[in-house]
């Protein structure tokens, strides 16, 4: 799950991520710039947010620790397409800020919008890897390795 702390507001949940004390570009104002809806809901309990907003909060909280790498495990699962589109844009902005993203995802349209390289696994073994190719041929080759 997203591990949103029920008794804490959106802002308090974000501040939990800063507990590492690591300095970097990700601060509460930077997260609010990335996710304006979180600023609007700053004093709302984190668990009162929609699923998409909770996912934004979870990503924002992870960024607050100013990591070199963020692991995103199926971050768009169960989310509306409009939220998936927003997250794709946000993931690209995060990467542009110098934070590496490791994306575990079956949504190929998201993969080709966000990833530069892919690695496909089956039963714990790597079965394919390479540069992400958004052409129809590249999508077909990538889709051959994804079972939903």
Tell me what each language-model feature is.
Residues 7-26, 34-39, 43, 130:
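ABC-type ATPase nucleotide-binding domains, specifically the catalytic core motifs of the NBD
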Residues 33, 120-129, 135-148:
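C-terminal boundary and immediately downstream tail of ABC-type ATPase nucleotide-binding domains
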Residues 45-49, 53:
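Conserved ABC ATPase signature
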Residues 62-63:
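ABC ATPase C-loop
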Residues 66:
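Conserved catalytic motifs of ABC-family nucleotide-binding domains
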Residues 84-97:
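Helical segment within the ABC ATPase nucleotide-binding domain
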């Amino acid at each position: 799950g997203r591990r949103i702390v029920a008794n804490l507001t959106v802002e308090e949940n974000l501040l939990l991520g800063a507990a590492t004390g690591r300095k970097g570009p990700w601060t509460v104002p930077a997260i609010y710039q990335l996710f304006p809806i979180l600023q609007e809901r700053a004093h709302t309990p984190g668990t009162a947010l929609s699923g998409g907003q909770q996912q934004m909060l979870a990503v924002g909280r992870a960024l607050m620790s100013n990591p070199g790498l963020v692991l995103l495990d199926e971050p768009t699962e169960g989310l509306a397409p409009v939220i998936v589109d927003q997250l794709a844009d946000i993931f690209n902005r995060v990467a542009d800020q110098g934070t590496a993203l490791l994306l575990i995802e079956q949504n190929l349209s998201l993969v080709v919008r966000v990833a530069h390289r892919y690695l496909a696994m089956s039963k714990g073994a790597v079965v394919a890897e390479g540069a992400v190719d958004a052409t129809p041929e590249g999508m077909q080759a990538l889709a051959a390795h994804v079972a939903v």
